[in-house]
UniProtKB/Swiss-Prot annotation:
Family statement: Belongs to the protamine P1 family.
Tissue specificity as recorded in UniProt: Testis.
InterPro entries hit by this protein: Protamine_P1
Protein name from the UniProt record: Sperm protamine P1
Gene Ontology terms describing biological process: chromosome condensation; sperm DNA condensation
UniProt entry keywords in alphabetical sequence: Chromosome, Developmental protein, Differentiation, DNA condensation, DNA-binding, Nucleosome core, Nucleus, Spermatogenesis
């Protein structure tokens, strides 16, 4: 399964050449982050 990460803005996602998609179900249940649900998520994003 692909890892999803929060993206604050589309521009940031574009910089990393990643695609941002709006997904509500992709919000991790353990980390209840509304940002992930409301904002954009990056597919195949590496963790820092």
């Amino acid at each position: 399964m692909a890892r999803y990460r929060c993206c604050r803005s589309r521009s940031r996602c574009r910089r990393r050449r990643r695609r941002c998609h709006r997904r509500r179900r992709r919000c991790s249940r353990r980390r209840r982050r509304r940002v992930c649900c409301r904002r954009y998520t990056v597919i195949r994003c590496r963790r820092r």
